[in-house]
């Protein structure tokens, strides 16, 4: 087996099982669309590679997924992207509060918080979800298979069906693309 085949094996197995997430994916997309239609926005948060994927998600919503499908920009914010706020809050309140303080400042009941985590146990994401729940927000978790605290707190859970950290992140990217595609379909009225 080549090194690429070795790396791809757990991903291939996980991708084969992603079909089991159709219902939670549709429910998450529906919640996001309801938020947008009521004047809300999507807030996204993650750490490390998951932060990069959170920003990828917000870029797809503000931009577009399909070049042939023009649509309005959708309101989405990656909470890790404002480095001045991140470091100020981290310095004054601690790393565990870097996302929660932002949710407290800009989160509203009509908004959605989407968190990405391979561990499902990052304290700064748990604090952010708590802050979102206190505001009456819908929360979505793109997580790993192993049930951790975030699984219990999020309104919708899209759990990558693997224990491989790399495959979890790679599944999250697929889930992001499918989620944005579902949102675009619902907004365009073309969802089957």
Name each region found by the language model.
Residues 17-38:
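A short, well-structured juxtamembrane/interface segment
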Residues 39, 110, 136-137:
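Glycine-centered short loops/turns at secondary-structure junctions
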């Amino acid at each position: 087996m080549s090194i690429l085949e070795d790396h791809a094996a757990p991903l291939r197995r996980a991708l084969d099982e992603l079909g089991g997430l159709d219902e939670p994916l549709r429910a998450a997309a529906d919640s996001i669309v309801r938020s947008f239609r009521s004047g809300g926005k999507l807030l996204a948060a993650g750490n490390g590679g998951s932060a990069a994927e959170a920003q990828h998600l917000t870029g797809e919503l503000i931009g577009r997924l399909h070049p042939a499908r023009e649509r309005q920009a959708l309101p989405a914010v990656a909470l890790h992207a404002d480095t001045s706020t991140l470091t100020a809050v981290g310095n004054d309140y601690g790393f565990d509060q870097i996302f929660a303080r932002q949710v407290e400042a800009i989160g509203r009941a009509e908004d959605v918080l989407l968190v990405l985590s391979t561990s499902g146990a990052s304290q700064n994401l748990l604090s952010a979800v708590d802050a979102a729940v206190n505001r009456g927000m819908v929360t979505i978790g793109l997580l790993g298979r192993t049930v951790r605290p975030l699984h219990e707190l999020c309104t919708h859970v899209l759990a990558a069906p693997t224990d491989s950290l790399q495959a979890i992140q790679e599944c999250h990217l697929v889930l992001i693309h499918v989620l944005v595609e579902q949102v675009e379909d619902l907004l365009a009225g073309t969802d089957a």
